Regions:
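A short glycine-threonine-serine/GTX helix/turn-capping micro-motif
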Residues: 1-8
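Metal-dependent amide/peptide-bond hydrolase catalytic core
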Residues: 8, 12-192, 202, 207
Length: 207
């Protein structure tokens, strides 16, 4: 539609996109939340009068609240359709990460072992929520429980992201200590298993 003849006809995709974003809670974004508070994160937007695209990341440590956030996005899409006409919004939701706590609850020894290794290299562990998706979260839901370990870096995902060499060396030492401790535990468990199945001298037959 030509802008000179647009009255009552033109629907600007970009303005509809702005309206869509305005329907989401303005204070529930990364810049206004912390700790275990969830958020909506607009990561990319592009468009013309005819077509516009908004890309979001939705995060929440609570599965229930996570589902509620997805419902809120769907409700926003329905509201835009009511305002501009059905079919205005094409909504795609794709789950990528969940809170790995659900998968680690039955194998907390993985975290305890990591804490032990940190202390052995002189670092007191600090447990903080990871406010984003991680490879460990995906691996945990693929059947390989994988808690997040620190790297020593700072300012992640920013242009000033960095990691001191000293921190890398310390974390490398911690990982080596963790592997050594796990290897020793494995040897002990193997030795114990063999002892349970070995027959005492002079015994015959099964059992």
């Amino acid at each position: 539609v030509h802008p000179g003849d647009a009255k009552g006809k033109m629907i600007s995709a970009m303005l509809a996109a702005i309206d869509f974003n305005a329907l989401l809670p303005e204070n529930e974004i990364p810049a206004c939340t912390e700790g275990y508070e969830g958020f909506y994160h607009l990561t990319e937007m592009s468009g013309t009068v005819e077509e516009a695209t908004l890309s979001y990341i939705i995060r929440d440590h609570s599965r229930e609240k996570f589902e509620q956030r997805k419902q809120a996005v769907a409700a926003a899409a329905e509201e835009i359709d009511r305002k501009y006409g059905r079919g205005t919004v094409e909504l795609t939701l794709r789950d990528s990460y969940y809170n790995m706590k659900e998968k680690l609850a039955d194998c907390m020894f993985l975290i305890w072992d990591a804490e032990k290794a940190l202390r052995e290299v002189g670092v007191e562990p600090v447990i903080v929520p990871i406010r984003g998706g991680t490879d460990g979260a995906r691996l945990s839901y693929e059947g390989l429980p994988c808690p997040n370990l620190c790297t020593g870096g700072e300012n992640y995902h920013g242009r000033f992201e960095y990691i001191p060499v000293e921190d890398m060396e310390l974390i490398t030492k911690m990982l080596a200590t963790l592997c050594w401790n796990l290897a020793q535990e494995y040897k002990i468990s193997r030795r114990s298993a063999r002892s349970d199945t070995e027959k005492p001298p002079g015994s015959f037959g099964p059992g």
